[in-house]
């Protein structure tokens, strides 16, 4: 990854701080993973403040596969089994069965319906019976150690929410180019500038967590 492209967004610590500010204000962030991994950028929002307009942007500008990142505790609370028993995906992305809210949706596929499903799944008193299976929202189970355990967008999302003091649940979707190909760093930065979204990397989150842990010790 050409880190020099990220220079306008500040240092790693400054990039994370900008992302946390954006999330606290109910806005989104763009997170890029390692070049030797997926080498993709995800548009990420806090699940608790997600709006219909933000969901529409995810559907319109991204891959359309909108995922809900949840902690292992929340996955257990909702009794969501893995999508498959033997996960053979290249990076072990922990998809569960897809979900739909049982109340307040029509076909489940519209932006408003997907937001309704997400709000139902993250409600404090949510129970398995609140959700139909399958559906049009794809939960992902984050590993408990965050980016220290797995350098994925799922864990990065949960880490960012916790660092921002928000409910540990986030929504993500991969950024794609208009021709359907996956966006790389130059296109992701351009997208961020177009939509006034901060850009950071998984490595930035790793570094930020290390620094904050050292300060706390």
Swiss-Prot record:
Cofactor(s) this protein requires = Mg(2+); Mn(2+)
Kindly state which reaction or reactions the protein catalyses: D-ribulose 5-phosphate = (2S)-2-hydroxy-3-oxobutyl phosphate + formate + H(+)
Give binding positions for Mg(2+) 2: 38, 153
Q: Which keywords are on file for this protein?
A: Lyase, Magnesium, Manganese, Metal-binding, Riboflavin biosynthesis
Q: Which GO terms describe its molecular function?
A: 3,4-dihydroxy-2-butanone-4-phosphate synthase activity; magnesium ion binding; manganese ion binding
Q: Where does Mg(2+) 1 bind?
A: 38
Listed binding positions for D-ribulose 5-phosphate are: 37-38, 42, 150-154, 174
NCBIfam families in alphabetical order: ribB
The record's comment on protein family reads: Belongs to the DHBP synthase family.
Q: What is this protein called?
A: 3,4-dihydroxy-2-butanone 4-phosphate synthase
């Amino acid at each position: 990854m050409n880190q020099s492209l990220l220079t306008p967004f500040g240092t790693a610590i400054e990039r994370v701080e900008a992302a946390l500010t954006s999330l606290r204000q109910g806005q989104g962030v763009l997170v890029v993973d390692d070049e030797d991994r997926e080498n993709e950028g995800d548009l990420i929002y806090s699940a608790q403040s997600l709006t219909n307009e933000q969901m529409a942007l995810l559907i319109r500008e991204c891959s359309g596969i909108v995922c809900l990142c949840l902690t292992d505790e929340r996955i257990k609370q909702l009794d969501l089994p893995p999508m498959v028993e033997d996960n053979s995906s290249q990076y072990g992305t922990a998809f569960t069965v897809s979900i739909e809210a049982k109340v307040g949706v029509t076909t489940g596929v519209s932006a408003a319906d997907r937001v309704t499903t997400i709000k139902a799944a993250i409600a404090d008193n949510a129970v398995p019976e609140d959700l139909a299976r399958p559906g049009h929202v794809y939960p992902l189970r984050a590993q408990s150690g965050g980016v220290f355990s797995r350098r994925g967008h799922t864990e990065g999302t949960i880490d960012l929410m916790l660092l921002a003091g928000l409910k540990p649940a986030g929504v993500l979707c991969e950024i794609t180019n208009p021709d359907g190909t996956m966006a790389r760093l130059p296109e992701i930065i351009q997208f961020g500038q177009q939509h006034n979204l901060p850009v950071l990397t998984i490595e930035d989150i790793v570094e930020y967590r290390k620094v904050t842990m050292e300060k706390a010790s």
